[in-house]
């Protein structure tokens, strides 16, 4: 799915739930969040008997747990019938496309266009630190943002100069 399609889905979800907090969105949508010791796995999504579950490694700090929740919410929203843990472990199918889409979803959910554009002079690391997200998430957001010049051109930050 294109970044613009993911952006539209995220905007609708934020409008519907009134928040960009992935934990609150899950609560509003009836998605259960479970914290477990998952070893090296950060998290995963499971659909079981019409119930949706997001499992998050209980060893993660709040910042990482929030990102993992946003990423897994991306799977819930974009790939509700695909069990990527099953695909990875049992079938060795290539899941890179699904993972990239879930990362783009998380970036769109947790980082606004304004967050990037108003801090464009700063390094990726500085923006990540300021927003309390990973550097990779900032890179995903920037990739999607700069792929659509209209988002930049129409932003008030650039029109005021």
Feature names for model-found ranges:
Residues 1-161:
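Active-site hotspot residues in diverse enzymes, especially metal/ion-binding acidic/histidine motifs
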